[in-house]
Amino acid sequence: DVCTVDRALYEHDSFDGFRVVHVPGHSPTDTLYLHESGGFTVTGDHIIQGVNPNPIVRRPLPGQERQPSLIQYQQSLLRTRYLPLGKCYPGHGQPFSNHIEVVDHILERQEKRNEKVLNALGQEAQTPWMVAQRMYGNMSAGDFIFCVSVAIGHLELLEHRGVLRCWRDHHGVLWYQRKNAGIRHAFIIPETETTRESVQ
């Protein structure tokens, strides 16, 4: 069936006692519906007890840049941690009331995954695809987007924190390397490649 949109909702809007809180990351449109007087929140897939929701890399809309989904997600999680959510009704699983503990658990698991990404990266310059292969081996078609999204998300996060440097080669491919490592690639690439540092 085709549904008609009666009303577009935006950050800080309210309806029927609910407050709209935009929490992008897991998906660009993730939203909390916070009912403070009722003491509960519809959290959807933003936080789920016992699950580490993975932000999937998505193609940007025409004229827009792709957003760093994992960085967005962590920012949204830190915001969510301090909201008075009360009882949470997620998109999957059972309701829960310990949202601070759930948020902290997700953030802890992401830090552990950062270490796995760094271990897979080693001291060489690698692409996100190469890191995903080192982490997951042969990926099925169904797991491909998940595995590559994990690699891209954590590489972007580590670059954002100043741990990695990143540059784009003349084919448009992104490469990442630890900042404390000399320039070494996992395999030979053309000497005409330019790095972000050399352009600046």
Where are each of the predicted segments found?
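Generic structural signal for short, solvent-exposed loop/turn connectors between secondary structure elements
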Residues: 13-20, 37-39, 122-126
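Acidic/polar short surface loop at catalytic or gating sites that assists cofactor/ion binding
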Residues: 1-3
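Short acidic-hydrophobic, aromatic-tinged amphipathic segments that line or gate anion-handling sites
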Residues: 6-10
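C-terminal regulatory/interaction regions
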Residues: 115-200
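Metallo-beta-lactamase
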Residues: 19-114
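Short polar/acidic secondary-structure junctions
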Residues: 14, 23-25, 169
